[in-house]
Swiss-Prot record:
Domain of life: Archaea
Biological role: Involved in the maturation of [NiFe] hydrogenases. Required for nickel insertion into the metal center of the hydrogenase.
Protein name: Hydrogenase maturation factor HypA
Keyword flag Zinc: yes
Pfam family for this entry, one: HypA
GO annotation (BP), single: protein maturation
This protein's UniProt keywords: Metal-binding, Nickel, Zinc
Lineage per the UniProt record: Archaea, Methanobacteriati, Methanobacteriota, Thermococci, Thermococcales
GO molecular function: nickel cation binding; zinc ion binding
Protein family: Belongs to the HypA/HybF family.
Binding positions for Ni(2+) per the UniProt entry: H2
Membrane is among the record's keywords: no
Biological source species: Thermococcus sibiricus (strain DSM 12597 / MM 739)
Binding site for Zn(2+): C73, C76, C110, C113
């Protein structure tokens, strides 16, 4: 389960950030989940809560935001969102994209011109979007 590895990295990053800034406590973390990554938020939240026990982040509040997947065609410049085409995916394709997001290029084409030459402009990956530490202004 890669959610546990992600959780470990998130908690370690927040703690390191607090320590680098001379703070004794992490109060909150905002975690961005890319839609294309399709991370199980419930498992990730559970893992973060377990990993932060006994640390300066133990009482930190968690906030999750979902970043919609967006694409831009390199051929015609068209921009579209995953939600616009996702209903055409079967469960196998959804699972393939979950584990290896790069395969999205094998299953998606620009809805405007049909090109498979596009870039993922948003909604990929998982990252710590914000950290609130002791002493931050409200």
């Amino acid at each position: 389960m890669h959610e546990w590895a992600l959780a470990d990295g998130i908690v370690r990053t927040a703690i390191e950030f607090a320590r680098q800034h001379g703070k004794e406590k992490v109060l909150a973390m905002r975690i961005s989940l890319g839609e294309l990554q399709d991370v199980n938020q419930e498992i990730l939240e559970f893992a973060i809560n377990e990993i932060k026990k006994g640390t300066i982040a133990e009482e930190a509040e968690l906030e999750f935001i979902i970043e919609e997947a967006e694409f831009k065609c390199r051929n015609c410049g068209n921009e579209w969102k995953l939600k616009d085409v996702k209903e055409s995916f079967n469960e196998t394709i959804k699972e393939d994209i979950h584990f290896i997001p790069e395969v999205v290029h094998a299953f998606l084409a620009c809805p405007n011109c049909g090109s498979r030459d596009f870039e993922v402009t948003k909604g990929r990956g998982v990252y710590l979007a914000a950290i609130k530490v002791e002493g931050d202004d409200e």
